[in-house]
């Protein structure tokens, strides 16, 4: 609604000029009062969240002013531009396109006004998915200082939607030069996407691109995971271990994502004891159920189920956890004798498991979107690097 209120500022200006002309030309207080009431009514509709009614009323006011041809040139441009925007806001993009195209082609307006028309015309094309036409307009606007940043942002949106990652990287680099703190995360993610779009045999270029991602965003866990994967494909397991273990310092929230590949590397190196040492160190730094479960599994493989069960029991007494309790119960079931007691354990284990399934393991920290797998771009709010594993506290 706030955006729509700003959108209506030109209407207010045109309306004020129009009312002044009407009052100066003739004594028509009844008409003036009618329009004044309409404007106030429209604002009230907005404030009461009746957006559709407000848009209808403001459209009617603008169209009446246009029909009577009593708006000065500058105000008429703003009014028509806004009229097109209002049509777009209510889904009538074809009418918005006609209005904005007419403004762009009209010989009656200045170069700066036509740039505004081009900007809104590009937005119309974006809404209907004509990305090639929007792209052409935004490329023109990039050369105009007042429009450049917005045009670059929209071009980046287009290239991300069309998955043209080399172009996306080029635009993201320009945005990062303008505002590094706001754009470096997105630039790093564009580097990651571009690296994944390259052919498998382009390993050298992939590494170079991923190193760029880490240079602009040192906490980019995705780049580290991709670099580790490249190292593993080349059989460079010690290098992969170094990269993966660094994630604990990079962003400990993602420690659970490295456990399987890290264990695989240590298995290939025949160094599972070092994997155990890493898990112990990680458990001292962060409270992460996956770390504790991985450690219990390792203890089971080395020393048997009883030792693993004792480890989980110790953990439960310190920090109760649904996930750890669920695994602990499985050990209890394995040891229990047949009978009602075991049946009760199986039922309880199943109920706890169903509760765990209902909890999404990942959540967007920006909009709250929940999902069952890790994505680097939120499908809901389109924010990069905002989806993270749900914490132990949220799980429990």
From Swiss-Prot:
GO terms for biological process: lipopolysaccharide metabolic process; regulation of lipid biosynthetic process. It is found in: Cell inner membrane. It comes from the Bacteria. Keywords: Cell inner membrane, Cell membrane, Iron, Membrane, Metal-binding, Repeat, TPR repeat, Transmembrane, Transmembrane helix. The chain crosses the membrane at residues 1-20. Residues 21-396 are cytoplasmic. GO terms for cellular component: cytoplasmic side of plasma membrane. This is Lipopolysaccharide assembly protein B. It comes from Haemophilus influenzae (strain ATCC 51907 / DSM 11121 / KW20 / Rd). The gene is lapB.
